[in-house]
């Protein structure tokens, strides 16, 4: 592989040039089979053929597919990757949803996008009956394409057309559909190609051969993982899929991985392995890419001093993951999220909010022009909601969030307003706020002292209706009204 990676012109170029011409014999994707022992390898040649099968299948199933939304509702699997390319190259709009959300959340998102088809893995994540009742005729298995002959590909994707929808948590209690185009993707690929070149020229350990392999435990419906699906074909790298954290060490042992995209919680686990002398169970893993929440700089420095490379990233779904990268292993910059890349404009406004402008910025929020106008100003600057400072060397340091979205160490985003609305349904609660405390979701509740047990029971019931990562794990009671500002708004600090 050449040190200079040629960024593809689009999704069509990614398949026809990168997969079929440049790296047909490279391993594209690995995963552990259902027996828990066998490693399945799919080369780029096979991958491209399956993408062609998916394109042919979708065009037959949805003859007027141009612009139609096709939903993926599945755990991490090879077929998810095939479908992602296939939907786009068939002319559809790719929609990735979190299969572990409650039915209330999924019902809202599905109702908003009005899917033509839903490709799903058939697993009951808690709302299978509701899904079948509402969308039964539109459900298809993830491997629906397997008996279809490979079809012809055409470059049918307009560079500025709506290419995909990915939902992101919002502070209003409702998720928002982020509209992304091929132009957004290609802008992001410029950054990730430079990341790959940086690894090649500066980071490759002695004796390590190319191409590299990347382990991912993050869900494919999340942008931090999805960018790997789109950014590795130009480099001919392999993506090792792990779908369950309980299988992490098993899969890592079976599939050698050089690099891993990780939530902070898993970086801490690897750090503990290092401290306990259990590095061998990592099977040669040496580079960790981390985003979503801050990491202890002392921990990062110690990892670096013991042969690991930890790259911190700052990006958003709204920018196709493009953003700020930190490659330094220097102690004074360990707490920085890094420096902005050269392909995008960045600034800190008068409040210290990070603003981004460039081809990576989304088209807007789906069917929500008001929310779009709130974050993209008349000059095209996207206001991220994150506050930061910049040092004399150009490194950015996140100092807080302009809004109240809670980012847990697991990388999950939680809207406090959503939980507060649920708690407000309890007659015994006078007022409440939900906040993060010691990496836990904590509810501070003002209620009569003799109603506290009733409130605890209500919180338990609310938790039963929520995904694990959203559950309230700490409750603090106060017999005094919660503090408010001069405008009467509750103070969260």
Label the predicted regions.
Residues 1-61, 66, 85, 111:
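N-lobe entry segment of adenylate-forming
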Residues 252, 258-262, 270-332, 345:
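Gly/Ser/Thr-rich phosphate-binding loop
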Residues 186-213, 220-284:
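Conserved AMP-binding/adenylation subdomain of ANL enzymes
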Residues 24-27, 150-167, 173-174, 203-213:
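Conserved pre-ATP/AMP-binding loop-to-beta segment of ANL
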Residues 358, 363-364, 387-470:
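AMP-binding/adenylate-forming catalytic core of the ANL superfamily
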Residues 55-101:
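Conserved AMP-binding/adenylate-forming
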Residues 41-45, 163-190:
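Conserved AMP-binding A3 loop
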Residues 339-342, 349-375, 395, 412-414:
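Conserved ATP/PPi-binding loop(s) of AMP-dependent carboxylate-activating enzymes
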């Amino acid at each position: 592989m050449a040190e200079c990676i040629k960024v593809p012109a689009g999704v069509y170029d990614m398949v026809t040039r990168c997969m079929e011409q440049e790296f047909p014999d490279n391993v594209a994707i690995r995963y552990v089979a259902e027996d828990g022992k066998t490693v399945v390898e799919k080369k780029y040649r096979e991958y491209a053929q399956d993408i062609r099968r998916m394109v042919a299948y979708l065009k037959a199933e949805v003859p007027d597919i141009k612009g139609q939304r096709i939903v993926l509702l599945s755990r991490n699997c090879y077929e998810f990757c095939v479908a992602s390319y296939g939907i786009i190259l068939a002319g559809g709009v790719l929609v990735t949803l979190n299969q572990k959300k409650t039915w209330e959340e999924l019902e809202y998102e599905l109702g908003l996008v009005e899917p033509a088809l839903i490709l799903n893995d058939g697993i009951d994540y808690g709302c299978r009956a509701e899904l079948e009742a509402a969308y039964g005729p539109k459900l298809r298995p993830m491997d629906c394409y397997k008996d279809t002959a490979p079809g012809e590909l055409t470059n049918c994707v307009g560079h500025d057309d709506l290419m995909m929808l990915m939902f992101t948590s919002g502070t209003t209690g409702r998720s928002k559909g982020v509209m992304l185009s091929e132009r957004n993707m290609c802008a992001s690929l410029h950054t990730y190609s430079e990341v790959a070149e940086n690894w090649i020229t500066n980071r490759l350990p002695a004796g390590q051969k190319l191409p590299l392999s990347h382990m991912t435990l993050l869900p494919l419906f999340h942008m931090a993982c999805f960018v790997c699906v789109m950014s590795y074909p130009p480099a001919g790298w392999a993506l090792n899929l792990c779908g369950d954290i309980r299988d992490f060490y098993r899969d890592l042992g079976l599939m050698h991985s050089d690099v891993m995209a990780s939530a902070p919680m898993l970086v801490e686990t690897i750090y503990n392995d290092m401290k306990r002398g259990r590095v061998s169970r990592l099977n040669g893993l040496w580079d960790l890419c981390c985003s979503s929440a801050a990491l202890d700089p002392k921990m990062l420095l110690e990892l670096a001093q013991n042969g690991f490379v930890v790259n911190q990233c700052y990006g958003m779904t709204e920018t196709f993951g493009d953003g700020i990268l930190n490659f330094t292993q220097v102690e004074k910059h360990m707490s920085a999220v890094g420096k902005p890349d050269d392909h995008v404009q960045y600034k800190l406004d008068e409040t210290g909010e990070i603003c981004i402008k460039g081809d990576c910025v989304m088209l807007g929020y789906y069917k929500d022009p008001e929310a779009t106008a709130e974050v993209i100003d008349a000059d095209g600057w996207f206001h991220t909601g994150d506050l930061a400072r910049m040092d004399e060397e150009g490194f950015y340091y996140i100092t807080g969030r302009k809004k109240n979205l809670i980012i847990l160490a697991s990388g999950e985003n939680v809207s406090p307003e959503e939980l507060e609305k649920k708690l407000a349904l309890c007659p015994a609660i006078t007022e409440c706020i939900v906040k993060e405390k010691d990496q836990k979701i904590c509810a501070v509740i003002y209620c009569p002292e003799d109603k506290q047990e009733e409130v605890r029971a209500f919180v338990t019931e609310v938790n039963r209706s929520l995904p694990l990562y959203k559950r309230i794990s700490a409750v603090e009671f106060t017999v005094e009204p919660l503090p408010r500002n001069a405008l009467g708004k509750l103070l969260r600090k």
